Swiss-Prot record:
Pfam families: OTCace, OTCace_N. This is Aspartate carbamoyltransferase catalytic subunit. It comes from Cupriavidus metallidurans (strain ATCC 43123 / DSM 2839 / NBRC 102507 / CH34). Belongs to the aspartate/ornithine carbamoyltransferase superfamily. ATCase family. Heterododecamer (2C3:3R2) of six catalytic PyrB chains organized as two trimers (C3), and six regulatory PyrI chains organized as three dimers (R2). Coiled coil: none annotated. Pathway: Pyrimidine metabolism; UMP biosynthesis via de novo pathway; (S)-dihydroorotate from bicarbonate: step 2/3. GO terms for cellular component: cytosol. The lineage of its organism: Bacteria, Pseudomonadati, Pseudomonadota, Betaproteobacteria, Burkholderiales. One of its GO terms (biological process) is 'de novo' UMP biosynthetic process. PANTHER family: ASPARTATE CARBAMOYLTRANSFERASE, ORNITHINE CARBAMOYLTRANSFERASE, MITOCHONDRIAL.
């Protein structure tokens, strides 16, 4: 008897209960999240004195960040508060996990404090899945980044940014540049881009920083920066994740910038209206030149702004779906 695989993110009716990965989400589901985010962007842009909606009033959102974060944790906190939720940011270093308590023990204790949603960042790939398997039926889990595996809300806000500036995914060439081997953002972006019908996704980087299997995902691989940037509509730059590297994968940051840094001269090889993105934090002079990061084609700060609305959309959608 064949066992039917069930996506752990979805309810029995196929609705989004947790957001653990973009992989496995349909084009319609991703589009629904982006459309919902548009409504929250309009709320932020409006003249309303109070930019809040009561969607999560009376709900408790626990931000559990086992890795450092500035943008992601802050935007999740702002998003939850704009949805009128009560927000708790757990200080991991001061918590019982630093004294040897297991991850599931921590989750069980926090669940006993009437948590309705966990936003989780963890160094171990799969940690949010483990949590989602063990929480009470009414509790929702959102992956804010797990190891090298996935960063689904970053992927979604990247898609929102691309759609905002380029409108149609089906005629774009998108280049992802840098340390793709260690990047959970790259994996989420690739799954989202291919699901949304982008005809050409390129990966640009040195052989030591590109994972195997990219071609099987429909990605064109380039080791030469100039060749890879020719005629692209979108450039997504990634930082070097030195904290995840084992061994000497690069000669030096200076040599890396010479070969793969995005300079105005290299950006000129892309289409004249190409946009430049970066999930942050940026390392100026390593993967990107300040003239590009602060230039007219950069939409990096737009990504941060849109991230609040996208995370509001995700939280609002999952909170409404239970088995």
């Amino acid at each position: 008897m064949t066992k039917t695989f069930r996506n752990p993110q979805l309810t029995k009716n196929g609705e989004l209960k947790h957001l653990l990965s973009i992989e496995g989400l349909s084009r319609d589901m991703i589009t629904h999240i982006l459309d919902t985010a548009s409504q929250f962007v309009s709320l932020s842009d409006s003249d309303r004195e109070v930019k809040k909606v009561p969607l999560l009033r009376g709900k408790s959102v626990f931000n559990l960040f086992f890795e450092n974060s500035t943008r992601t944790r802050t935007t999740f906190e702002i998003a939850a508060k704009r949805l009128s939720a009560d927000v708790l940011n757990l200080n991991i270093n001061a918590s019982s996990t630093s004294k040897g308590e297991s991850l599931l023990d921590t989750i069980n204790n926090l669940s006993a404090m009437s948590a309705d949603m966990f936003v989780v960042r963890h160094a171990s790939s799969g940690a949010p899945y483990l949590i989602a398997e063990h929480v009470a039926p009414h509790v929702h889990v959102i992956n804010a980044g797990d190891g090298r595996h996935a960063h689904p809300t970053q992927g979604l806000l990247d898609m929102y940014t691309i759609r905002h500036f380029k409108k149609d995914f089906t005629n774009l060439t998108v280049a992802i540049v840098g340390d793709i081997l260690h990047s959970r953002v790259a994996r989420s972006d690739i799954h989202a881009l291919t699901t949304l019908g982008v005809p050409e996704v390129r990966a640009i980087g040195p052989r030591t920083l590109l994972p195997s299997g990219l071609e099987q995902m429909g990605v064109r691989v380039f080791h030469n920066m100039e060749e890879g940037l020719k005629g692209v509509d979108v450039v997504i730059m990634l930082r070097l994740q030195n904290e995840r590297m084992t061994g000497a994968l690069l000669p030096s940051a200076q040599e890396y910038f010479k070969a793969y840094g995005l300079t105005p001269e290299r950006l000129a090889l892309a289409k004249p209206d190409a946009i430049v993105m970066h999930p942050g934090p940026m390392n100026r002079g390593v993967e990107i030149d300040s003239a590009v990061a602060d230039g007219p084609q950069s939409v990096i700060l737009n990504q941060v702004t849109f991230g609040i609305a996208v995370r509001m959309a995700v939280m609002g959608i999952v909170a409404g779906n239970n088995d």
